[in-house]
Amino acid sequence: MKVIVTENKIQGSAKAFEIFEKGIKNGAKVLGLATGSTPEILYQNWVKSDLNCDDLTSINLDEYVGLTPDNPQSYHYFMQKHLFDKKTFKKTYIPDGMTKDVPAYCKEYDQIIKDNPIDIQLLGIGQNGHIAFNEPGTPFDIGTHEVKLTENTIKANARFFDNEDEVPKSAICMGTANIMDSKKIVLMAFGEKKAKAIKEMIEGPITEEVPASILQKHPDVTVIVDTYAAQELDDKYKN
């Protein structure tokens, strides 16, 4: 893993965009994208840039089950608001949270990923080490699946809703196996609340109890953290 420690989220987001921009200019065509507060500034940089996205395909990590695309808390809505309304992509894929047959749809999404191998995958990380909605205990070999959200994840996402009861209880998400198939991975984390997860991901044992720890086995991972998220790391990663 390559670890880049920046002073703050703004610098970290700029560094992440540099990696995506360079990758795209060097031929990357399929991008795995993420949602949430972590990548917002990255997407702002993307929108302000002159980067042409006409030939790009994007595949998003996840979507809440039961939210329509026009629901302001859906990840469809998030992506439209922060990127797709301003930059035209050749094709965009986001899991369908309103599908009537979730298991069949998950197989379809796996096929989409197989047909469009991801060149660069963007990730965040949860305080418990989850990536996408792959919670602790999720098998490393799993593909796209429906996941019941943990109480902690529901609480963490409640800030985006009027109250905790409105947070969906499950989501469709790419599995760890899908993520590991990406050619390159860029993971961003900011703030001291992420420090423990970052340390366990990079320095801890590879275990399904820390889903992100599997990234130690990937050949091309760049981790971008601010000084707060890096504070528990061994000094050798802070240079």
Swiss-Prot record:
It comes from the Bacteria. One of its GO terms (biological process) is glucosamine catabolic process. GO terms for cellular component: cytoplasm. InterPro entries: Glc/Gal-6P_isomerase, Glucosamine6P_isomerase, Glucosamine6P_isomerase_CS, NagB/RpiA_transferase-like. It is an enzyme of class 3 (hydrolase). It catalyses: alpha-D-glucosamine 6-phosphate + H2O = beta-D-fructose 6-phosphate + NH4(+). The keyword Hydrolase applies. The gene is nagB. NCBIfam families: nagB. Catalyzes the reversible isomerization-deamination of glucosamine 6-phosphate (GlcN6P) to form fructose 6-phosphate (Fru6P) and ammonium ion. This is Glucosamine-6-phosphate deaminase. It comes from Lactobacillus acidophilus (strain ATCC 700396 / NCK56 / N2 / NCFM). The lineage of its organism: Bacteria, Bacillati, Bacillota, Bacilli, Lactobacillales. Its EC number is 3.5.99.6. Transmembrane segments: none annotated. Keywords: Carbohydrate metabolism, Hydrolase.
